[in-house]
Curated annotation (Swiss-Prot):
UniProt enzyme class: transferase
Purpose: Monitors brassinosteroids (BR) responses and homeostasis, particularly in the root and hypocotyl in darkness. Promotes flavonoid biosynthesis.
InterPro entries: CAT-like_dom_sf
Catalytic site positions: H151 (proton acceptor), D369 (proton acceptor)
Protein location: Cytoplasm
Assigned keywords, A-Z: Acyltransferase, Brassinosteroid signaling pathway, Cytoplasm, Transferase
Name of this chain's protein: BAHD acyltransferase BIA1
Family: Belongs to the plant acyltransferase family.
Species for this entry: Arabidopsis thaliana (Mouse-ear cress)
Reported induction: Accumulates in response to brassinosteroids (BR) treatment. Induced by darkness in roots.
Record gene name: BIA1
Keyword Transferase assigned: yes
EC identifiers of the protein: 2.3.1.-
Length: 435
């Protein structure tokens, strides 16, 4: 079901108190992150106040929250963030649709409408670092709260930390959180001359295909079957992420090969949150920034690969990164070591199929409560040409045991992918969110 939204208001929300700093140093990883928003949409089916009161409370609490997350109210200037209190953009919209009807007949193509609208041709460098859009459904049936934050300063873990703090402030009137920013704690700052050398993320000249985003749901029973199939002597008990990512990569690779006269090498890049792998004395678990690393899996153009083989390589490479982190912590070289690892993939030839995979599982999306309960559903969308990439994002289902996979592929590959019977043996294409 397509959602037709009408924007009813747009304003800039500034921090309730002035920024305590003038600038925030960006790391070399921040600057290499693409000029895109990291975005999530929270859907709520119960609002205890009127839409006017709810919206006003969100604005007031956002202002208070920005006082703690003050860089998000700033703007990027060169190699740092100017903490100039320019503010975040707050957009309000309405739709006549009822939330239950929308979730029962979900049209994933319409989800981008719940994200902030960017001016045509506007450079990512000019975007606000934080944009919020609140959409009220018809007859008081629910509300969607979307949060988009620049990937130049935040990863998904940072976004969740921010939204939880904002929700707590809305619901309880205050938050006692102490916020720390990663800056160059892990990754070093770039040399001052490097700014002119950075590749532009403002151009879409390299985008030659139309990309399509689809949602697939893995129920717990099917995940158990898949894990059993993915098991091997070297990895007798795969994780659900290992099993699902391996299946998706195999099927996506097969879809690509079916559309190519000459098969290409395939590389899968799996992102990792290093907060979970470093002691809190180095960086707190809820530190704000891009604290990501990862590892790659490579297959030659003619290689055939089965799921247990992919899982075994997945586990081996993941453990290699974990061991590298432990060793580099002792020598205080963690940032340089992880950058070298990521450079292996970045330097790959452009004539390859590159798949960017990220697991958002175990992130507390469903704990985001603005005062009237947990979300009925958490959705994902991308909304600009800069988000066009072959990628996969995994998110927990509300019950926590199932997984929703959001998969972006070139249109011609997706038309084959959605009919892959090996995939459909374990996943359902876009089932209703509510019965």
């Amino acid at each position: 079901m397509e959602a037709k939204l009408e924007v009813t208001g747009k304003e800039v929300i500034k921090p309730a108190s002035p920024s305590p700093r003038d600038r925030l140093q960006l790391s070399i990883l921040d600057l290499y992150c693409p000029g895109i928003y990291v975005s999530t949409i929270f859907f709520y089916d119960l609002i205890t106040e009127s839409s006017e009161v709810f919206s006003e409370n969100l604005k007031l609490s956002l202002s208070e929250t920005l006082s703690r997350f003050y860089p998000l109210a700033g703007r990027i200037e060169g190699l740092s963030i100017s903490c100039n209190d320019e503010g975040a953009v707050f957009t309000e919209a309405r739709t006549d649709l009822l939330l239950p009807d929308f979730l029962r007949n979900l049209n994933t193509d319409s989800l981008s409408g719940f994200l902030p609208t960017l001016a045509a041709g506007e450079s990512p460098a000019a975007w606000p670092l934080l944009s919020v859009k609140v959409t009220f459904f018809g007859s008081g049936s629910g509300v969607a709260v979307s949060v988009s934050v620049s990937h130049k300063i935040c990863d998904i873990a940072s976004l969740v930390t921010f939204v939880k703090d904002w929700a707590t402030t809305t619901a309880k009137g205050k938050s006692n959180s102490t916020i720390e920013f990663a800056e160059t704690t892990i990754y070093p700052p770039p040399p001052s001359h490097m700014y002119e050398q950075f590749p532009s993320t403002d151009s879409d000249s390299n985008i030659t295909s139309k990309y399509v985003l689809k949602r697939f749901v893995f129920e717990p029973s099917k995940i158990a079957e898949l894990k059993h199939k993915a098991a091997s002597e070297s990895v007798p008990v795969p994780t659900r992420v290992e099993a699902i990512m391996s299946l998706i990569w195999r099927c996506a690779r097969n879809s690509s090969r079916s559309n190519l006269l000459i098969p290409r090498q395939a590389v899968m890049w799996q992102a990792m949150d290093i907060r979970l792998r470093i002691p809190s004395s180095v960086a707190p678990k809820d530190v704000i920034g891009n604290l990501q690393s990862g590892f790659s899996l490579k297959k030659d153009a003619e290689s055939e690969f089965e799921i247990p083989e992919i899982v075994a390589t997945f586990r081996k490479n993941k453990e290699r990164v974990n061991e590298m982190i432990k060793e580099s912590l002792q020598g205080n070289t963690i940032g340089q070591s992880l950058l070298s690892l990521m450079a292996e993939t970045v330097s790959e030839s452009t004539e390859i199929d590159r798949y960017i995979m990220s697991s958002w599982c175990r992130k507390p999306f469903y704990e985001v409560d603005f005062g009237s309960g947990s979300p009925v559903w958490v959705g994902y969308a991308s909304h600009t040409i800069y988000d066009n990439m072959v990628g996969v994002v995994l998110i927990d289902s509300k019950e926590g045991d199932g997984v929703e996979a959001w998969i972006s592929l070139p249109e011609e590959d997706m038309s084959v992918f959605v009919d892959d019977q090996e995939l459909l043996a374990y996943a359902v294409l876009n089932p209703p969110v509510v019965a």
